[in-house]
Amino acid sequence: MAPLKTSVPDTMDKIDMLLDDIIKLNKQEQNRNQLKGRYNGSFRQFRNSWGRWGAQRTSGAGNTLRSQGLKKRTYGVKTGLAMRKMASWKGTSPLNRPPLSVRNSPGQLVSFRKRMNLQRSPDFGVKTSSSLQRYYLRSSSYAQTNTFRSGFRMDQQRETRQATFLSRRGLKVQTLMDMDQHLDLPELSRTPPWRTSVSSGGTLTVSIDNPSAVTSSSSLGSRLPRPPFPFLTKKEGSETKVPKGVPLEFDINSVAKQTGITLNERFKILKEQRLAQAFTKGNRFVTVG
């Protein structure tokens, strides 16, 4: 497309021209400059797929970085410490993790045992129990088994609530674990005796105290109450302090007990008391009859 030629010669002085002609001439010069920029190839106007217009830089004097093989940094790129922090976020999203009901299913338990067998040492059957405990404390699978135990315990809270309910009412609660279920999982078999069973096949035994039965010394020792806490014990030397204040001039009990006297009777008694006091002190006025 050839540039438009002006109807007015360029050599004509703009002072002698009319205002409308000057405006037309300026517009034509502006259009001519835009066409020159297009032919140079510095900018190219395009329309993208979502219907917006934009300017695309194709070639020209301004693209020195691209000609030298350098890449311009895009806006919003994470670098340095922020990039390291973003890399630590990689992993399984909480939205993609299976729920506890699926996680504790038999299929998940089998995969967990396979993972345990892969992480065992080669001479696993020769070691003693103490060395096995030290091995599992040092191994990285110890944290995984702890998380598995916590999830497994959350699924078995009904027996725990029932045992707590009965123990608060003075009933002794004892849980029996099926130890044959956890022979290949030493972490699950190392549950302390004071905790409730986390196995699905646990038996709950409740024993009620019988006063007619013969009590032994061992059972009496287990039923003894705990010593009181030091912050709950009352000190012997502490005495009740008398509160500081203004002492009352009257007995409030005597005022409160005068409920059988009416107001007229009370005023009559007070009037008689005033008259009696006036006669004892003597009258200032003399009545002449």
Swiss-Prot record:
Which InterPro entries does the protein's record reference? FYTTD1
Instruction: Look up the domain of life of the source.
Output: Eukaryota
| GO CC field | nuclear speck; nucleoplasm
Short sequence motif named UAP56-binding motif, residue ranges: 11-29
Q: Where is this region: Disordered?
A: 213-238
Give the record's keywords alphabetically: mRNA transport, Nucleus, RNA-binding, Transport
Q: Name one GO molecular function term.
A: mRNA binding
Q: What Pfam families does the record point to?
A: FYTT
- Annotated compartments: Nucleus, Nucleoplasm; Nucleus speckle
Q: Where is the signal peptide?
A: none
Which chain regions cross the lipid bilayer?
A: none
> Belongs to which family?
Belongs to the UIF family.
Q: Function, please?
A: Required for mRNA export from the nucleus to the cytoplasm. Acts as an adapter that uses the ddx39b/uap56-nfx1 pathway to ensure efficient mRNA export and delivering to the nuclear pore.
What name appears for this protein in its UniProt entry?
UAP56-interacting factor
Species of origin: Xenopus tropicalis
What gene, per UniProt, encodes this protein?
A: fyttd1
